[in-house]
């Protein structure tokens, strides 16, 4: 439910909150409503070559994994990350993981290459 708040508002879903969120999800693009049915389908399919997760505006999320449990874990991490962003918003602005720190994660965990 929390994740869909980002799909329906167009607010950026920044998963650079904690290392686990970025490692599991990487940076998540958002595609226009109905992209899985129209001329965006090929572009959408291309995204899954380099990332496991995409959002569809006012629609849903698409997530992949090599096993069902892995796919579910990503969805669960995404929803908890979304919930943490929503709950933290009244406390102040997000202090995301930096690009340098992301590069360290990319190298250490062999993701997003």
Feature locations, PLM:
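Glycine-rich flexible loops
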Residues: 1-113
């Amino acid at each position: 439910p929390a994740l869909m708040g980002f799909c329906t508002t167009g607010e950026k879903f920044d998963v650079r909150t904690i290392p686990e969120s970025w490692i599991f999800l990487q940076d998540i693009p958002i595609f226009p409503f109905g992209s899985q049915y129209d001329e965006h389908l090929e572009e959408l399919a291309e995204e899954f070559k380099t990332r496991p997760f995409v959002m569809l505006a006012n629609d849903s999320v698409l997530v992949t994994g090599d096993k069902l449990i892995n796919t579910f874990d990503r969805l669960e991490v995404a929803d908890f990350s979304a919930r943490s962003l929503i709950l933290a918003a009244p406390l102040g602005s997000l202090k995301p993981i930096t690009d340098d720190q992301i590069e360290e994660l990319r190298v250490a965990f062999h993701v997003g290459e």
